């Protein structure tokens, strides 16, 4: 049995077993017993996970169907179908880092980096659940940062004014107050007590539209304060928004087109909230109102929403220096 010390300080052992050579890695120099014990462990694992990756992927989803959100279950089921037959057919115990890298390379040929990362995340999750000893170090495509149009204060006010008195008025105002589409569409009148609106559920699609009683994150379970004018409007109408999240975006797009405003996502109203709220209240309060779980995510949103202002400041600085 030959033991090689590598430049990294690790030790490598190549061991022949039943006509097949196995490469074993150790952090410290092993003795013969260490090698035998490790080989026995590997053989046991190989005998446990004898079915295919596809089998264990479906088993993972089934075993967690009561705790995963419907949208997550739907996404995972879709991802199984886009994985190649070759990879889905691999015996779980035989899957190597090279197999995963090959599958990711194949998928990355005609898919966006974000989609590729989602697929890898699912594969890694399944492998991590059944073979936690397999540590993946897959090379993934670099993220592409797209500069989408972000609404200005004038854009937001124009849309709110145009929507006054319509069935969209309440939903648009709630969007400016940081609410997500799925949260708005799940609201019922008993969520409003006085001026306080309790946000604790989402309308999500899983074969049909269903109300999910738990929020997207723990921070999503929150209470926000509504002004008297908005409370009165909600009380008089007796509802918040009658349609689906998809319809809410369609309605927003109609106003954007009518007013000559570049299209942006309904979610970008949260970005507007982040930039504005950060100027008038402590960061912790803004995060709590918007339901951001971490300051990292909040700051990412805030930095993106302030992009145009940074550009304006940079241009002003350059013009002053060079003029």
Please place each PLM-identified region on the residue numbering.
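Catalytic-site neighborhood detector that most strongly recognizes the C-terminal catalytic loop/helix
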Residues: 150, 203, 283, 290-316
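A Lys/Arg-rich helix-loop hairpin that forms a DNA/phosphate-binding surface
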Residues: 45-58, 70-74, 84-105, 241-243, ...
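Basic, Lys/Arg- and aromatic-enriched nucleic-acid-binding interface segment
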Residues: 113, 133-187
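Short, aromatic/basic-rich helix-turn unit that serves as a nucleic-acid recognition element
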Residues: 18-21, 52-80, 107-112
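N-terminal DNA-binding recognition helix of tyrosine site-specific recombinases/integrases
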Residues: 82, 90-105, 109-139, 179-182
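Short, basic (Lys/Arg/His-rich) helix/loop patches that form interaction surfaces
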Residues: 161, 236-296, 316
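Short, surface-exposed polybasic/aromatic micro-patch for ligand or macromolecular engagement
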Residues: 1-49, 217
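Conserved tyrosine-mediated DNA breakage-rejoining catalytic core shared by Y-recombinases
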Residues: 187-233
């Amino acid at each position: 049995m030959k033991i090689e010390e590598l430049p990294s300080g690790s030790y490598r052992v190549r061991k022949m077993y039943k006509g097949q050579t196995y490469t074993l890695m150790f952090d410290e120099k092993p003795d013969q017993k260490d090698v035998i014990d490790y080989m026995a462990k590997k053989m046991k694992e190989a005998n446990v996970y004898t079915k295919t990756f596809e089998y264990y992927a479906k088993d993972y989803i089934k075993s967690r169907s009561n705790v995963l959100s419907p949208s997550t279950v739907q996404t995972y089921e879709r991802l199984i179908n886009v994985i190649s037959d070759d990879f889905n057919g691999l015996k779980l115990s035989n899957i190597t880092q090279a197999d995963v890298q090959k599958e990711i390379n194949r998928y990355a040929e005609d898919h966006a980096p974000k989609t590729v990362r989602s697929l890898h995340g699912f594969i890694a999750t399944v492998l991590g659940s059944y073979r936690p000893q397999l540590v993946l170090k897959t090379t993934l495509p670099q993220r592409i940062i797209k500069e989408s149009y972000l609404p200005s204060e004038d854009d937001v006010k124009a849309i709110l004014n145009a929507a006054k008195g319509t069935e969209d008025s309440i939903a648009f105002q709630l969007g400016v107050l940081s609410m997500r589409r799925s949260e708005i569409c799940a609201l019922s009148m008993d969520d409003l007590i006085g001026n306080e609106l309790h946000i604790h559920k989402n309308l999500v699609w899983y074969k049909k539209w269903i109300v999910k009683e738990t929020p997207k994150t723990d921070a999503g379970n929150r209470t926000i304060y509504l002004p008297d004018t908005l409370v009165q409007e909600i009380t008089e109408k007796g509802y918040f928004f009658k349609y689906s999240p998809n319809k809410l975006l369609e309605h927003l797009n109609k106003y954007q087109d009518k007013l000559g405003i570049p299209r942006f996502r309904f979610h970008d109203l949260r970005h507007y909230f982040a930039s504005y709220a950060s100027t008038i209240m402590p960061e912790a309060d803004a995060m709590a109102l918007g339901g951001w779980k971490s300051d990292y995510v909040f700051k990412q949103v805030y930095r993106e929403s302030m992009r145009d202002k940074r550009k304006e400041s940079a241009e002003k600085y350059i013009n002053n220096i060079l003029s």
